[in-house]
Amino acid sequence: MERSYVSIDLKSFFASVECVERGLNPLTTNLVVADSSRTEKTICLAVTPSLKSYGISGRARLFEVVQRVGEINAARRRKVPGGTFTGKSYNDPELKKNSALELDYIVAKPQMSHYIEMSTRIYDIYMKYVAPEDVHVYSIDEVFIDLTAYLKTYGLTARELTQRIILDVLRSTGITATAGIGTNLYLSKIAMDIVAKHIEPDADGVRIAELTEQSYREQLWEHRPLTDFWRVGRGYAKKLEAHGMYTMGDVALRAEYDEDSLYKLFGVNAGLLIDHAWGYEPCTIADIKAYRHGSSSLGSGQVLQCPYTFDKARIIVREMTEQLVLELVEKRLVTDQIILDVGYDIESLSRREIAAQYKGEVVRDHYGRQVPKPAHGSCPLGRQTDSLKLIMDAGFGRIWEIDGAKAVPGKYIDLSISGVDVGIPE
């Protein structure tokens, strides 16, 4: 029986949540999600579609946004009589209607816990239509759903059911989505990532594209660049192009007459690449559900520009904790322990008053210089969880009680969560 899968991606999710919270339209409001209290080198976690239309990348650094908006406004100003703007706006239709307005945008500080809550709320909407065993959460803003068993139940086509689900999400949350429908997981993902991006959205901003193995070959065998395809990174693309393969059609052709050369290039991974070149995907959602995660920990580390005091370091660790919990939720994992390591360098004791007060152990670094001994500690959570609140409340405070964490300004911070496993929070 031919299966019907859909891949749903929430449009500029973090940015859309921030717009909805402000009562603004996510499709027409110029907004970036970034922590402007840090340096302008900070990466924007999301950019709204209207701001992207001005040539701003979805993962730009904040200074790049500032620079690009400056260029746009310089060009707009030249067209204004007298060279003076009459006002400014972050509403894109208003900007397009009135060239005398300066392009403005909102910088929204990331709220990871809020995004997780909204993602959970949207997942609950999916559960109104399908069962959990037919859903794979790929990330906080993207899911795969096997619609096969539900089409007869609802008396709808895969496109009609997808449209119904997406419109329910839109009406309930104000957030729109892009979707791809395919006869396997790979085709649904490619339909969403490549085909849907090149079609006009409907009145609600929704794009839905469909692919079969045959239409995939007809439409995308000549598509470039190769990096647009799922699981083809720059390294793969560079290696393929170095051997005369510039499209998926080229890969499929090479597999027909010289399959061994692909295995020599990519080893066992060549099998998946060949399958994808032909539009095949043997993996199902049931297979994904049966898979056991191999890693038992997740981690995050930062080298700070200068040694941070305890209070400043707490802010950094809080952000790192939010990012790790977000990764837990994205991967449908749980944890039962958090671990903190704080490292130091010679700058940590550079101020005389701090050096005079420090009573802890001193060790030598790789260069033989004296530095404070690194601080290390862990905090069991008592149960497996992916709750940001529980991890913050139960672990965040206690972990700072480790010896040395508060003693002197730290330069290196490593945070990890261990006991990670696939499972349902207790």
Report each predicted region and the residues it spans.
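DNA-contacting surface of Y-family translesion DNA polymerases
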Residues: 7, 228, 238-410, 421-425
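Short aromatic/hydrophobic contact patches that present stacked aromatics
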Residues: 144, 380, 414
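C-terminal helical/tail subdomains of lipid-metabolizing enzymes
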Residues: 417-419
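A short glycine-rich, hydrophobically flanked beta-strand micro-motif that places a catalytic Asp/Glu
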Residues: 177, 181, 336-340, 413-415
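Gly/Gly-Pro- and Ser/Thr-rich, intrinsically disordered tail segments characteristic of DNA damage-repair
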Residues: 1-275, 282-285, 426
